[in-house]
From Swiss-Prot:
This is Large ribosomal subunit protein mL57. It comes from the Eukaryota. Component of the mitochondrial large ribosomal subunit (mt-LSU). Mature yeast 74S mitochondrial ribosomes consist of a small (37S) and a large (54S) subunit. The 37S small subunit contains a 15S ribosomal RNA (15S mt-rRNA) and 34 different proteins. The 54S large subunit contains a 21S rRNA (21S mt-rRNA) and 46 different proteins. mL57 forms a heterodimer with mL44 and stabilizes rRNA expansion segments 1/2 at a membrane-facing protuberance close to the point of attachment of the ribosome to the translocon in the membrane. It comes from Saccharomyces cerevisiae (strain ATCC 204508 / S288c) (Baker's yeast). One of its GO terms (molecular function) is structural constituent of ribosome. InterPro entries: Ribosomal_mL57 (IPR040030), RNase_III_dom (IPR000999), RNase_III_sf (IPR036389). Belongs to the ribonuclease III family. Mitochondrion-specific ribosomal protein mL57 subfamily. Present with 6500 molecules/cell in log phase SD medium. GO terms for cellular component: mitochondrial inner membrane; mitochondrial large ribosomal subunit; mitochondrion. Component of the mitochondrial ribosome (mitoribosome), a dedicated translation machinery responsible for the synthesis of mitochondrial genome-encoded proteins, including at least some of the essential transmembrane subunits of the mitochondrial respiratory chain. The mitoribosomes are attached to the mitochondrial inner membrane and translation products are cotranslationally integrated into the membrane. SUPFAM superfamilies: RNase III domain-like.
Length: 253
């Protein structure tokens, strides 16, 4: 017993040998690929954070982007206040940057429904002058609902044309499926239409239905504006009728 205790005490008194550690610094180099996607290579964020017009998302200038958008859409005219962040969200589609940035999907859905409501009201109240008033009272034109023109007012083609005519497309952040092919194949029509609807949804959710309705009636459905949805829809309907007429004429030849 005494021998075992002596052995333990001796073992505890043994000096502890320090471990020799050699610290080495290792430098790693990460290659960030630019250009077309290649499997296994990490892409440079800058390559997918630019929109088709070359604008870098992280370097958006408020004066060059948001302020111009406010002016184009005449937001101050209706007392509408949208933050820079919300405007940028309205301009950003889900396809951009793998959906990592705030995008406009829900605002688009909200705005599309409110636009349909306002265009229905517009169609009900806008008939021919002779039919609009009966006995000095406003007559609602229910026959206007469901017409080709009424449907065209809220079509994606009409909204897309509105965005292009007002030069909003350079500010839109989205990803082209194939940069070599034209915008139609890349889904440009749907994406541009979603931006206009998103602005309506943003105005409705932050400024209220009254200002949103005034914005639609004043900026989008003004007959005096050559680039309004009303005049664009009229041109689209006339163009469609002309194409049908041409086909019928060729069929008889």
């Amino acid at each position: 017993m005494e021998n075992s205790m002596m052995f333990i005490s001796r073992s505890l008194r043994r000096p502890v040998t320090a471990l020799n550690c050699n610290l080495q610094s290792v430098r790693t180099v990460i290659y960030l690929h630019k250009g077309p996607r290649i499997n296994g290579l990490r892409r440079d964020p800058e390559s997918y954070l630019r929109n088709p017009s070359g604008v870098l998302f992280t370097e958006v200038n408020a004066k060059e982007c948001q302020d111009k958008v406010r002016s184009i859409l005449q937001l101050p005219k209706y007392g509408i206040n949208l933050s820079n962040e919300l405007i940028l969200q309205c301009l950003t589609h889900k396809s951009f940057a793998h959906g990592s940035k705030p995008y406009n999907e829900k605002l688009n859905l909200l705005g599309a429904q409110f636009l349909k409501l306002q265009t229905c009201i517009h169609s009900l109240k806008n008939g021919s002058p002779a039919e609009s008033c009966e006995n000095g009272q406003l007559s609602l034109q229910f026959s206007n609902l469901g017409t080709k023109f009424a449907k065209e007012l809220t079509s994606k083609n009409t909204a897309c044309t509105f965005v292009k005519l007002h030069n909003l497309d350079p500010f839109i952040f989205w990803k082209m499926r194939d940069p070599i092919k034209d915008g139609h194949i890349n889904g440009e029509t749907t994406i541009f239409a979603s931006v206009l609807n998103a602005f309506i949804g943003a105005i409705l959710s932050t400024n209220g239905s009254e200002k949103a309705a005034k914005f639609i009636q004043g900026s989008l459905l003004d007959k005096e504006d050559l680039h309004s949805l009303v005049n664009i829809a009229n041109e689209n309907v006339a163009s469609a009728k002309a194409k049908i007429s041409d086909k019928e004429n060729k069929a008889f030849l």
